[in-house]
């Protein structure tokens, strides 16, 4: 019996919608990253993007445990000398709640072109509305 290898043109990708309301950030992000990679499928192949599209709603209501709401710090750099910026979890949720989930999931995906292709299949929205109704996403309970 020959080893099966998925081909990019034969991969079937589904659309799923996930409600992040009350979900713990890290536990949600690991499941999302696994599904974006396609590890839940029998035809998973490490060097082929076999994952599904995922829409995350209610990003502003994601939960963290302990004191992370005030103690967790996100760093970024402007590119200029002395241009390091920082924001706490609370500030990030207030400014752009989508970025919190995006950053958590992106760090769990492979680095390089394949990881960027997987990351592009993640759609995160702060509220309950999304503009992907035409794709008929199925509800995914995580």
Curated annotation (Swiss-Prot):
Presence of keyword Ribosomal protein: yes
Q: Which GO terms describe its molecular function?
A: mRNA binding; structural constituent of ribosome
Any Gene Ontology CC annotation: cytosolic large ribosomal subunit
Question: Which sequence ranges form a coiled-coil region, renumbered to this chain?
Answer: none
Q: Which GO terms describe its biological process?
A: negative regulation of translation; translation
- Disulfide-bonded cysteine pairs: these are none
Classification via CDD domains: Ribosomal_L13
UniProt entry tagged with the keyword Secreted:
no
Q: Which UniProt keywords apply?
A: Ribonucleoprotein, Ribosomal protein
The record's section on Gene3D superfamilies has: Ribosomal protein L13 (3.90.1180.10)
**Role, per record:** This protein is one of the early assembly proteins of the 50S ribosomal subunit, although it is not seen to bind rRNA by itself. It is important during the early stages of 50S assembly.
Describe its assembly.
Answer: Part of the 50S ribosomal subunit.
Q: Which family does it belong to?
A: Belongs to the universal ribosomal protein uL13 family.
PANTHER family annotated for this entry?
Answer: LARGE RIBOSOMAL SUBUNIT PROTEIN UL13M, RIBOSOMAL PROTEIN L13
**Protein name (record):** Large ribosomal subunit protein uL13
In which organism is this protein found?
A: Yersinia enterocolitica serotype O:8 / biotype 1B (strain NCTC 13174 / 8081)
What gene does this protein come from?
rplM
């Amino acid at each position: 019996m020959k080893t099966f290898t998925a081909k990019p043109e034969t991969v079937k990708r589904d659309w799923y919608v996930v409600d992040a309301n009350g979900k713990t950030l890290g536990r949600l992000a690991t499941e999302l990253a696994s599904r974006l990679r396609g590890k839940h499928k029998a035809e998973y192949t490490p060097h082929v993007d076999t994952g599904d599209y995922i829409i995350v709603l209610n990003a502003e209501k994601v939960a963290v445990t302990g004191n992370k709401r005030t103690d967790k710090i996100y760093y970024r750099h402007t590119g200029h000398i002395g241009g390091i910026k920082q924001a706490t979890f609370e500030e990030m949720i207030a400014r752009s709640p989508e970025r919190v989930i995006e950053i958590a999931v992106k760090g769990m995906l492979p680095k390089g072109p394949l990881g960027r292709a997987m990351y592009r299949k993640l759609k995160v929205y702060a509220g309950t509305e999304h503009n992907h109704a035409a794709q008929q996403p199925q509800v995914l309970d995580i």
